[in-house]
């Protein structure tokens, strides 16, 4: 992950830890929400992260991102690694990918995920991910900042995608990193499906049909609840519970959206079809707006519960926008982040530039 971005994203957390570690402990330590979107490009929003609006800004509708930006600071040149696991491991450990050496996405234990090449020899890397304990080869060992928050009195909640470690390693479980609540997080880096009609990847007997089946959402099976909404509802319930503990909370709201498969979120799909978008692009846009609704629901919870002025909200994506698969995006490919080149998985700027917003009332100047 870009060093300056990582430093900026962790400044609020470091400040919190420093304050709590003194003898004069305030009663109002801030809550922290990291709202991380999967595969969201820098233009996949109605909020322009440039000097001018683009055609993609005109296409999508993300009013809650706009609201968050009005209340906080936009980072118009924010960067991540070009793919999921490296960014997520950097956020968890504070280490650049060149240091933790999780340089591609993780899934199966002791198995690399690199493409086969006749011209390049890929160096050995930590394909088992990260962990807090020794004992697994090709693993980077570090204490997560979540563990530090928990040890210093924060209630810690994980909701959504994890993707820090391979299957059957300590790093596959959010509980291993200090989370007290885990909603739907496991080793896989994407969902089998967002559709409750398909039980998010489970058969009727409750058996997983894929390594990408999303666990822990059984109550929503066959209810017509799109997974983005199911995760949001579970996060809100976890916040209701956290409110009773009389301690600050850390919520890692880590959506699977807008990772493939680009399933239609029927709450928003028809709107984009009426705009003239193709089936693929309307489905993609519906995923984006569903994510934005989730952001709005969480911001509404903060307002209704009197926590808005005492909560840091950090909005990010884990890499550049998806632009490489004709099964999910319209051709010509590699143009979806234009004028930047390429997209997710590429070291070109289209693969590493992402939207970022930070809101911290009374500390970060609004509208900057």
Enumerate the language-model features and the residues they cover.
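Formylglycine-dependent sulfatase
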Residues: 2, 9, 20-368
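Bacterial N-terminal signal peptides
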Residues: 7-15
């Amino acid at each position: 992950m870009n060093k300056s971005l990582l430093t900026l994203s962790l400044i609020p957390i470091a400040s919190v830890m420093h304050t709590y570690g003194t003898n004069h402990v305030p009663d109002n330590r801030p809550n922290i929400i990291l709202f991380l979107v999967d595969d969201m490009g820098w233009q996949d929003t109605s909020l322009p992260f440039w000097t001018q609006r683009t055609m993609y800004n005109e296409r999508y509708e993300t009013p809650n991102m706009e609201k968050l930006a009005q209340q906080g600071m936009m980072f118009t040149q924010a960067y991540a690694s070009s793919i999921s696991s490296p960014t997520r491991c950097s956020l968890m450990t504070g280490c650049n990918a060149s240091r933790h050496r999780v340089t591609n996405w993780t899934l199966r234990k002791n198995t690399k995920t690199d493409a086969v090449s006749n011209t390049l020899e890929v160096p050995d890397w930590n394909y088992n991910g990260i962990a807090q304990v020794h004992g697994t080869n090709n693993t980077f060992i570090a204490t997560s900042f979540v563990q530090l928050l928990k040890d210093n009195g924060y209630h810690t909640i994980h909701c959504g995608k994890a993707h820090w470690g391979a299957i059957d390693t300590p790093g596959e479980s959010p509980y291993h990193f200090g989370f007290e609540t885990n909603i739907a997080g496991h080793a896989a880096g994407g969902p089998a499906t967002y559709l409750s009609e398909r039980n998010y990847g489970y058969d009727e007997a409750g058996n997983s049909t894929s390594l990408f089946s999303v666990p822990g959402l059984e109550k929503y099976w066959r209810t017509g609840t799109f997974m983005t909404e199911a995760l949001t509802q579970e996060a809100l319930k976890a916040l209701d519970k956290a409110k009773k503990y009389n301690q600050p909370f850390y919520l890692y709201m880590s959506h699977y959206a807008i990772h493939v498969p680009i399933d239609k979120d029927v709450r928003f799909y028809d709107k984009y079809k009426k705009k003239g978008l193709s089936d693929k692009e309307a489905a993609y846009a519906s995923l984006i707006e569903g994510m934005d609704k989730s952001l709005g629901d969480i911001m509404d919870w903060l307002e209704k519960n009197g926590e808005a002025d005492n909560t840091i909200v950090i909005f990010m994506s884990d890499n550049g926008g998806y632009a490489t698969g004709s099964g999910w995006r319209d051709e010509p490919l590699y143009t979806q982040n234009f004028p930047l080149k390429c997209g997710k998985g590429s070291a070109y700027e289209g693969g590493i530039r992402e939207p970022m917003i930070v809101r911290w009332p009374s500390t970060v100047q609004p509208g900057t």
